[in-house]
Amino acid sequence: MSTAIVVFSGGQDSTTCLIQALTQYDHVHCITFDYGQRHNQEIEVAKKVAIELGAASHKVMDVGLLNELAVSSLTRDNIPVSHELQENGLPNSFVPGRNILFLTLAGIYAYQLGAEAVLTGVCETDFSGYPDCRDEFVKSINQSLVLGMDRQLEIKTPLMWLNKAETWALADKYGKLDYVRNHTLTCYNGVIGDGCGDCPSCDLRKNGLDAYLENKESVMADLESKL
């Protein structure tokens, strides 16, 4: 029996990963991290979506210490989410160490459950400039977890080389485009579905959806060539 863990936020990307994983593994468990994020409504959304889609279990883990250590517009209500890059070349929504912590804890959880894979929705194509979403980083932490726990584990990134239009196409391939569009929370300002329409996350989501809906056959063909 195959088992996987999905690092799950209830957003477009992780929900699409969950939808795909449910067709590929016998048991799929979700893990969501509560770090006092600005859009903390995502935790309730994640709970609802995990149940509705049929995850075997859903664990919410308190990692509030990350909020104390990592200053970001996603961890501080008094820091507005900006469309501009900071002096260090990163968006102010970058939470230092977030995916290092999340993937490490997900790896430990996989060890506990005997899961062979951890899935995460990070990608390098339409990403927001976060260094911990790069393929190089994921491969590095995967190797460290295998060495540190002396157990085989694969961190899978189904969306790594997909653009946002292709991510929408992937949801549509499994008949879940409308579900992902209407029930997930990607917006930094906590607006479910199509979002606030103003934050960087909503821009990426909308632009990708528009690109897919305008040229579905071509985008789906591009997706199929990458699967």
Curated annotation (Swiss-Prot):
GO biological process, one term: queuosine biosynthetic process
Keywords: ATP-binding, Ligase, Metal-binding, Nucleotide-binding, Queuosine biosynthesis, Zinc
SUPFAM superfamilies per the UniProt record, alphabetical: Adenine nucleotide alpha hydrolases-like
Residues where Zn(2+) binds: C187, C196, C199, C202
Molecular-function annotations in GO: ATP binding; ligase activity, forming carbon-nitrogen bonds; zinc ion binding
InterPro entries the record matches: QueC, Rossmann-like_a/b/a_fold
Cofactor(s) demanded: Zn(2+)
EC id: 6.3.4.20
Amino-acid positions noted as binding ATP in the UniProt annotation, renumbered to this chain: F8, S9, G10, G11, Q12, D13, S14, T15, T16, C17, L18
Keyword Transferase: no
Pathway(s) the chain acts in: Purine metabolism; 7-cyano-7-deazaguanine biosynthesis
UniProt catalytic activity: 7-carboxy-7-deazaguanine + NH4(+) + ATP = 7-cyano-7-deazaguanine + ADP + phosphate + H2O + H(+)
Residues of the signal peptide: none
Highest taxon of source: Bacteria
Cofactor binding annotation: Binds 1 zinc ion per subunit.
HAMAP family (UniProt xref): QueC
Similarity comment: family membership: Belongs to the QueC family.
Role description: Catalyzes the ATP-dependent conversion of 7-carboxy-7-deazaguanine (CDG) to 7-cyano-7-deazaguanine (preQ(0)).
Protein name stated in the entry: 7-cyano-7-deazaguanine synthase
Native organism: Aliivibrio fischeri (strain MJ11) (Vibrio fischeri)
Gene: queC
